Amino acid sequence: MKTISIFFVIILMSSSHAEDDVLCLKGFKSSLKDPSNQLNTWSFPNSSSSICKLTGVSCWNAKENRILSLQLQSMQLSGQIPESLKLCRSLQSLDLSFNDFSGLIPSQICSWLPYLVTLDLSGNKLSGSIPSQIVDCKFLNSLALNQNKLTGSIPSELTRLNRLQRLSLADNDLSGSIPSELSHYGEDGFRGNGGLCGKPLSNCGSFNGKNLTIIVTAGVIGAVGSLCVGFGMFWWFFIRDRRKMNNYGYGAGKCKDDSDWIGLLRSHKLVQVTLFQKPIVKIKLVDLIEATNGFDSGNIVVSSRSGVSYKADLPDGSTLEVKRLSSCCELSEKQFRSEINKLGQIRHPNLVPLLGFCVVEDEILLVYKHMANGTLYSQLQQWDIDWPTRVRVAVGAARGLAWLHHGCQPLYMHQYISSNVILLDEDFDARVIDYGLGKLVSSQDSKDSSFSNGKFGYVAPEYSSTMVASLSGDVYGFGIVLLEIVTGQKPVLINNGEEGFKESLVEWVSKHLSNGRSKDAIDRRIFGKGYDDEIMQVLRIACSCVVSRPKERPLMIQVYESLKNLGDQHGFFSEYSDEFPLIFNKQEHLK
């Protein structure tokens, strides 16, 4: 009923404001710095120009220029929050998170945008106090101001936001006591503010002169005794830390102790799982433990370089996938939360969405949506999937990876590409997982000789000398995936009974091509069924991806376009529209 009432009010007042919304965006763009040209699609030939398909803009409907939502996160925009927003009167959701906005939060923001339901200004450089006038956003459900430079106390007026379900003020410079009515938002909503006290953080204390004298005296006596004990314990901690390399918490480096990691999780079973979208029912760590049968080996979906994934069947009938990262996180807690929040906002039809995470000491669990048909690797090795389905998978996976390289903001290298990170949903559409994890985990595996010498089969040959991941390295890995699709073979250690040799897939295919026996390299389950010309086209695309010189490999977007032409012949992907607005003048810049 509340949603209907908001909608009804906006409909009544909005018919005359379509031109105002155009002026709103024009003013917004002109008042900001946009160094990476994220808003280059924002052009306004006249006051009636359609704005509903501009980057980050969503409208109530496509036929009128009334803005429902502005989603402009992670675009490197800088400047103060523009006053022109007051012309977007129908706006319900404003997300300017993880940019470089500075200055004060406008005290008039809720009189400008009275129908806001979601306001996310997190991850900027905003300063000053939280305006008490935010109480005028009477429909506000979610308020995120974390990771800024806000000072002062938390205004008591926030307690009057009756619809507020999510509040995050963490990682600022706020001080004073937390209003008791806000304590139910949990510690995560307030941590990282050294001057804050009160539930759910530590209690606020007040000391008179007598109490202070007692505390200081006791502190001095205790300090002398502690110094003696501490000096003796120093050596024990020093030796232990050299052995374990700081194996607690964030920033841990080399730290995993696999002896009883499940026991560690059980001892923290009441820890809440952080979810990026507000759930109907909150999930705790114990729910994941039970849903995976105690992380039983029978629930393993796939084991990859980034970690082991487990199928989690929840009591309500829904299914998730829980990944335990194999390496520790070298980031600080603030850096980790910044990176994980960015990953949690990424949505694309060919990517597996990251739904949430849970951290217990050095253990990091990631929660993803479950894909019904498993991995591409398992499908190729265990089942007979026909050629049209393989084309569908190849195009979808290429689309997802190309979007990470050329359409996502910020851009992402994958670094873990393989047929085990390409999952298949119930319609056999490809969904890429494990993107962005290279920024979270220890770089130890990139220094491991078995990684650099190509043992895993997907690692580009130049990595053995440069030790630096690159976009062209992702293209090489995807080329191996295409070879798997065409040949049905594994990426490494092929054992051909007839000729008795073991080689990498690239070497095996190259030998067949150089001997004029390309047909012998094709999977017999798909050869001779009317698609041989298409199969050879994909083989040529694959070979272009795995050339030894990185600069001679195509861009991922070029690989996608080549494969999409094949998909169009099968009528699979006519609904795909242009989603790569960036223009690249120098291919070398991307490699």
Curated annotation (Swiss-Prot):
Glycans are attached at N46, N211. It is found in: Membrane. GO terms for molecular function: ATP binding; identical protein binding; protein serine kinase activity; protein serine/threonine kinase activity. Its EC number is 2.7.11.1. The chain crosses the membrane at residues 219-239. Its main location: membrane. Residues 295-573 form the Protein kinase domain. It is a single-pass type I membrane protein. It comes from the Eukaryota. The modification Phosphothreonine is found at T292, T389, T466. This is Probable LRR receptor-like serine/threonine-protein kinase At1g69990. It comes from Arabidopsis thaliana.
